[in-house]
Each structure stands twice: as structure tokens, then as C-alpha cells.
Amino acid sequence: IETLKSAHMEVEFFKFQKAFYTHKRIIILGNGGSNSVASHISQDYMKFHHKKVSILSDPSMITMLTNDFTYDLAYQKFLEYYVEEDTLVIIMSSGGESTNMLNCLEWCEINNVDYGVLTGFKKDNTIRSKAIHALFNYHIDSDSYGVVECVHQIFLHGVV
């Protein structure tokens, strides 16, 4: 409860809301529980907002990309294949230190692709710190995976 009281998501949520409504295509990325959040929210974005949403959760796609390009580059390769004009990439990393998510952030920076990040744990985590041109950069101050992932899901559901 204390974590939620100090969540302070309003400013970053309004930035996210603006980005969400000004992009037709959305790619949502995350590992583990964050990938589950991506899967769930992608359905709502498609159903309620008619957004074109892509996520990397298909086992055969994941194993092909990891086998051919390594796990650290698999999600970046997914972006290379799926990013189109008017795409917003949402990068989630509970701890903000996932190399594969950091590679996606750097790819977005280099290729001028609009993106935003959702992180937790340490306030000065690598992804949060390197998200120079992020349209939104929300951090939840908690070291609990469950709290971070649930708050990220609440944040993303704010437009539903």
C-alpha cells in the first residue's frame, strides 16, 4: 500500500496517454511477468482501441530469434522486423537491467523510433538512465517483482 501511495504516476501517465493516442501501432516488450503483462494489455488495446499491437510471446518465434541471434538480440531483431512508421515501442523491465531490453532501447534511440519505458527497483537503473528520448519514463519504487509488474499493468490499463 505504501508503494502505491508513493507511485506518483500522474505526470508520466499523461505523457504515455499522449503517446498512446498519437500512434497507430504499438509494440510491447518485456521478459517473464512483464511479457505476460504485455500479452494481456495488447488484447485490450486491440479490442477497445483498434490498435495494431505486436508482442514477442510466441514460443516458436522466441526460440528462432534466440537461436539465430542470441537472447540479448532477439527482441531487437523483432523490432527490426516489426517496426513501421507511426510505431510506439513500450519497453518494460522490472529491474531496469535486462540486456535484451536495453538493446531495444538503444536500437530505438539510434533509429529514431518513438518509445517509452516502465521500470522498477533502483531509481537509477540502467534502462531508466539511458532512456534519453523516451516519450515517458515511469519508475515504480519497489524491489518486489509482483508490485512492479502489477503497477505497470495498472499504468498501461489507464487508457482502456
Residues covered by each model-derived region:
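Charged, low-complexity, helix-prone segments enriched in Lys/Glu/Asp/Gln
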Residues: 1-3, 152
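A short, well-structured juxtamembrane/interface segment
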Residues: 3-23
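Glycine-rich phosphate-binding loops that contact phosphosugars or nucleotide phosphates
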Residues: 27-160
